[in-house]
Amino acid sequence: MTINRSRQPEDHEVARCRWLEPFLSHLQAARNVSPKTVTAYRCDLLQYFSFLKEQAGLDRLEAVEPERVEVADVRLFMGHLLDKGIQPRSIARKLASVKSFYRFLLETGRISSSPLSLVVTPRLDKKVPRFVSEEEARQLFRRFESQEDNAALQGDGKKAEVRQFETFRDRAVLEVLYGCGLRLSELIALERADVDLVHGFLKVTGKGRKQRIVPLGEPAVEALRKYFEVRRNFFRIPLERTGESSRVFVTSRGRQLYPMLVQRMTKRYLTPVSESEKKNPHILRHSFATHMLNGGADLKSVSEMLGHSSLTTTELYTHVTFSRLKEIYDKAHPGA
């Protein structure tokens, strides 16, 4: 049978898709995953169920019986994705979603065996993290001290006040991203109570709502202190009345920052100083890890500060450390 690859499941089909909603509810309740992650699981599994439906010649998703799926069906699904030009990394992610679904069915006694037990995840090349150089990072923050940037703070009126507020906020945002290695979602979710400027640390809520303590360097402490002072003066009416005051970083209207704003902000400030193709908030997280390891920090400590659940993830950054060690060796060793 020819598979209709363009058709998406309709809402009423999704609602009746067998065992999908119990699994998604389990993700939210037991594993504390984010809504964005739940949406990704939903999309991956609906694509899987839709393929099985078409493959079996069924007329609706609710007719798909996960317990009757065989290893060959899963491998056909992987081949179908490859045929569509889906990249191996994306296929591995979709396969991980399907494996999690069947693990849930096994644990809840809905099935007695999983067809995924004999399916091997495609081998992936490790992606080397992109980062800005230490000199580029210095130039990034030097721009805030330049006469050109300070000129934007001059003048009277509301527009000048907004520029001043946003300039101090932007510097604090970038100092925290680079100085603490936070994810974008973690930065946006920071509460005022999570910041301790006296002792110099942040309490960060990461993936799976796991909390960790991250040290604040002096540049980040100073940037936050100045930002909080400007913020107090800018919002003449206490933010407590707006319902938004608990967030550390807000817009000039007192609302919580949103991802696109921080992405645009990061690109705007990095473009003049960095030759890196990527100019997003995550590259500052990569730079934090790379520069920490280059400076001699141990892998376990960096892993804890990044909120990684496994050292394997952090090991991706060691390629830069080895490059740096080779550079030092070549310069220092007489026989190099």
Swiss-Prot record:
Pfam families in alphabetical order: Phage_int_SAM_1, Phage_integrase
Positions of the Core-binding (CB) domain: 14-106
Organism: Chlorobaculum parvum (strain DSM 263 / NCIMB 8327) (Chlorobium vibrioforme subsp. thiosulfatophilum)
GO CC, one annotated term: cytoplasm
Gene Ontology biological process: cell division; chromosome segregation; DNA transposition
Subunit composition and interactions: Forms a cyclic heterotetrameric complex composed of two molecules of XerC and two molecules of XerD.
Segments crossing the lipid bilayer: none
Protein's recorded name: Tyrosine recombinase XerC
